[in-house]
Amino acid sequence: MGIGYFNKDKTPDFFVSFAQGTWPDLSWTKQAMIDGATGKIEFSDSLGYYQTSSPIAVDFNEDGVDEVLLNVDYQVLDSIGLKSFYNTLLVISFETKEVVTLVEGIPGHNVASTPWAGDLDNDGFLDIVYSVGTNQFKTYTFDGLRVNYIGTKIPMTPKHQWGAYMGSEYDGVFKKK
């Protein structure tokens, strides 16, 4: 779950991403954004193949409204039906109702690694770090890991409140603005 200000009111909102099925037959993931003020589901989708990484909240376009950054797996079938898995980062804007691919698919699968957003190099701009398992032919494997870095020119003021697993302070506490 990720917490942020996904609309223009002053009440924090919630974004959840969860697998559907019964273990070990978990195949697809569903997502929903719940308006914190009304309790209504304002966004619902099924993006990608099974993974349990948490979403984070970042104001990418600096308009005072957070977007969700979500690590998503998807599968591709070749001409003889062999599955390959790829991983990408998606940005979801609830203001524009857009889902935008931040990076092209990387071969591999991410079961449970949440992206991180903050100022890694202390230059005042947003950095994103995320990881992907390197085995593109099997899920639920941990036989290789690729750590990826994205540097941006998005200013880090104010600090993002939910830029990591369980929030930017890693304590599961969301501090209202």
Regions found by a protein language model. Give the residues of each.
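Beta-propeller blade termini
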Residues: 1-7, 53-60, 71, 113-120
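Acidic/hydrophobic-patterned starts of short beta strands in beta-sheet-rich repeat architectures
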Residues: 8-18, 62-73, 122-131
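Short glycine/acidic-enriched loop and turn motifs that connect beta-strands
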Residues: 19-25, 73-79, 133-139
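A detector of repeated loop/turn-to-beta-strand junctions in beta-rich toroidal repeat architectures
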Residues: 27-30, 84-86, 143-144, 159
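Short loop/turn segments that connect beta-strands within beta-propeller blades
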Residues: 35-38, 94-97, 153
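A short beta-strand motif characteristic of beta-propeller blades
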Residues: 40-46, 98-105
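Short coil/turn segments at the loop-to-beta-strand junctions that recur within blades
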Residues: 47-53, 106-112, 166-170
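Blade-level signature of beta-propeller repeat domains, shared across WD40, Kelch, NHL, RCC1
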Residues: 114-177
